[in-house]
From Swiss-Prot:
Protein name: Delta(1)-pyrroline-2-carboxylate reductase
One GO cellular component, as annotated: cytoplasm
Enzyme class: oxidoreductase
Gene Ontology MF terms: oxidoreductase activity
Domain of life where this protein originates: Bacteria
Amino acid sequence: MARKSSAPQFLSYGDATGRLSWRDAVEALRQGHTLPQAQIRDVFLGPPTGTMMSRSAWIEGLGYGAKTFTVFDGNAARGLPTVQGAMLVFDKDDGRLQAIVDSPLVTEFKTAADSVLGASLLARPDSRHLLIVGAGTVAASLVRAYTAVLPGIERVSVWARRPQQAQDLIEGLDGIEADLAAVSDLPAAVGQADIVSSATMARQPVILGAWVRPGTHVDLIGAFKADMREADDALMARAALFVDSRETTLGHIGELMLPIASGAITAESVLGDLYDLVRPGARRRQSEDEITVFKNGGGAHLDLMIASYIARVMAG
């Protein structure tokens, strides 16, 4: 007799409140990168201001997943989320649909855990001061993830184009043991930080290499299209460059495409991705003074790693 299939879980953002751990999410990504390299495919449709993306992945030993979502730049003015969608998770052995996960839940944990995994492998171990550039949707989860996983962080500064937005973010954070402050002088803040984590929608650089002191780790999140970037050529040329995935960043995202086109760097300037970095003996930070840059480009394989972690936790 054929086995009766169980109905897939629908996991909303509210369902997961208080049940997920940033440390466990980062560990899920680390472990996921010890598995065979994922097969991934992306489809992007629509104009720059209203894009639909479908990102699919298969990871041997983990399963299959597909996330479809829209990104509408003008939704904030409408009182709607900029990003909306859902993630489907399928069983690795028989292809059953196991879970449908709210896209913002996957994206929040994937994005911040991706950056923090990179920082845990590349930032100086004595890093104490974290600067968050941007106070949008991602910023709060970055503060929570960094301070949960890197307990040495004692000070968190937040900069935003609209100072009140940075202040509102600070006031909305609770349970953070680090000192929190909104800052208005971005060049000075960058120059004082040990880790700079930038999550903006910038199409022109907001972080200049001239501002960054030796030993800083710079985490670049915001750019996800070919015309977007957050760092200037000078920073990219000075730094040891790493990415979460060569496949989803090189040739796809302006953060790398634009400095390659200008001749500031080459594709070979990228020294490794997370598959490389998690391996024992990998090329990571070489000195206390080296500047490291990690481009968080995302990808369906990361979504699948995090969605599978969420589904396991929620299944009890």
